[in-house]
From Swiss-Prot:
It is a multi-pass membrane protein. Belongs to the UPF0761 family. Gene3D superfamilies: Winged helix-like DNA-binding domain superfamily/Winged helix DNA-binding domain (1.10.10.10). The keyword Cell membrane applies. HAMAP family: UPF0761. Signal peptide: none annotated. InterPro entries: UPF0761_bac, Virul_fac_BrkB, WH-like_DNA-bd_sf. One of its GO terms (cellular component) is plasma membrane. Keywords: Cell inner membrane, Cell membrane, Membrane, Transmembrane, Transmembrane helix. It is found in: Cell inner membrane. The chain crosses the membrane at residues 66-86, 122-142, 162-182, 204-224, 228-248, 268-288. It comes from Halorhodospira halophila (strain DSM 244 / SL1) (Ectothiorhodospira halophila (strain DSM 244 / SL1)). This is UPF0761 membrane protein Hhal_0704.
Amino acid sequence: MHYQLRRRGTKMTELRGRLRAAGDRLRALPTHPGVGEARGFGEYLIQRIQQDQCAKSAGMLAYVTLLAIVPLMTIGFSVLAAFPVFEGVTDRLREAMVDYLVPAASDAIDEHLENFMGRAAELTAVGIAGLTVTALLLLNTIERVLNEIWRVERPRPTLQRFMVYWTVLTMGPLLLGVSVASTSYMGTVNLGPLEPPSDLIAQLLNLAPFVVQAIVFSLIYSLVPHRSVPVLHAVIGGVVASGLFELAKGGFAAFIARAPTYEVVYGALAALPIFLVWLYISWLVILIGAEVTQALRGYRWRTGGDLARNRWALVLAVHILGHLYQAQRRGAGVTFAELLEQEPDAGEPALAEALETLRRHHVIERSADGAWLLARDTSTFTLAELHRMLAYPLPPAAGLETGAPWDRRLAERLRRVEERWEQSFDLSLSDLLEPTAEEAGAGRSARAEVA
């Protein structure tokens, strides 16, 4: 028995050794540059998802959504009710939204929402104001989380944010109502000889949810963050999020159907935890899509170029102070994201380290809205002081002559330093190591005194 166990353990050890050797051989194989780039992008994306705590943010958004969904739908359907053309559309719109967004327990959720909205319609002006504040709280939380993903230090001004929120609360329901009304109308129109084949119609209808989701997610990623997001990046992120959302809907519905744990434990209240879990999954998918959108640009900035090297720390510091100096003359500050856009060759880590070093030495500081400002009088702050606080070697003058005006002036000073350095260090090692006549005489005198 013991022999068999030892033999089995030996075989497992051999198997692990072979697997480890096979993995080493695979890693040693030359890979296509695209494969390595894709792997690096995936690692960067996972790192950002962990750093931004997307799972935690999704949980927070799920709870806020649970509180705000009734106020949002109440305000939205109140807007639709103000237009006679949408009469009779609100019920179909609510049912369609619940069926579309909640893959399980949709009937129970729809019943609860209808009851809650009916009661909300009977509230006084104070109650309606409270519902509006709750809805605005959700929109503000969404904007804050997305701004954190894009490293936005300075949010929109209060008035501008209120206008954006109010536009979403009023125009969003109108667009949804127009969509549902148009779909219902097109379903009753006889297209005659131009009617496409039924198979094609079925395929288009099956594809419609994916396309609509991708458009909505793309608009969220491009409009909500207080940052300039390339349209192509937002579209790619929207498509990824839409695909993940469809997979999540199918998987969640299958899980609830085959493992009715919530119904067994909670009974009639099972719809609430099911809905809460689904809200969490939905927000996690949305945040992952946002991370993909951000990573399409951020991955290029992750390491930077020459300015990310310690040898060029002085040049990077001068660039940072130059941008802050120009902004100060306009009476403004510069955010981290704006600096990164102006100095993409620096990369996020090196730029963050340089800013922290300058802040630690009280050369710069951050304002209440997150912008960086100069904290020292530039007329009394010398280049020598800046170099001493960086604790890195001087960069070469070559390569700076064609840069910004401050680069050319810095290159001139560096050339003078290099010339004097050459003169000071124009000494052979023999001359350096050989004692001088004075040192030799002092040594003989010391030996004579000892004797």
